[in-house]
Amino acid sequence: MAPESDLVLLGEVMRIKGNAVDLVPEQILLGEFWLDSIRVWMQTRDYCRPPVDDFPVGSRWIMALAEITEVPEDGFDPSTPNQSYGRPFDFVLSSCGGYWLRVNGATAVGNLVPGMPRFYHQPDMSPVLIDLIAGYLDGAVPETALVEASRERPDVVDELILDTRSFLRGQEDWLPDTSPEDLEAP
């Protein structure tokens, strides 16, 4: 992730249009953005950007984006308006490094920590809490904590998680049908 990016946000893909995706921002992690949606331009020609097909509608991502301030002279072709460099004040997502993380619930995975090869976009790692990433971008969490949180879990831990899930499967029949609010204080 790039703390020097113009905008870092958590958002959900709501639409794909040509080589761009429209995101609904859920949380701004770095920078400022005030609109209800944001257009992010992806791969076309030989620009160092990921393909739009990697970001399906409904998927959630943390993206470190660069704002388009100027469109190059050959950046727009009227015969293919949905395949272009992008428009001024929209954003681009680079694939030349770790600029996006896949989000699942309250965690994210991807090319997160410094030192990972720049084109290694799906590393073996543990999911990292979004709040930890936000704390890192705010300067409240050190890089070492982020690196430690992302370390791949040992196989023993994965086995323990699977054993626990297996043990708990079917246990709902043994639990009372009351919520904590229904219980009386002693």
Protein language model annotation of sequence segments:
Residues 19-43:
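OB-fold (S1/OB) nucleic-acid-binding surfaces
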Residues 4-28:
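Structural detector for short beta-strands of small beta-barrel domains
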Residues 1, 39-51:
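N-terminal post-signal-peptidase region of extra-cytosolic proteins
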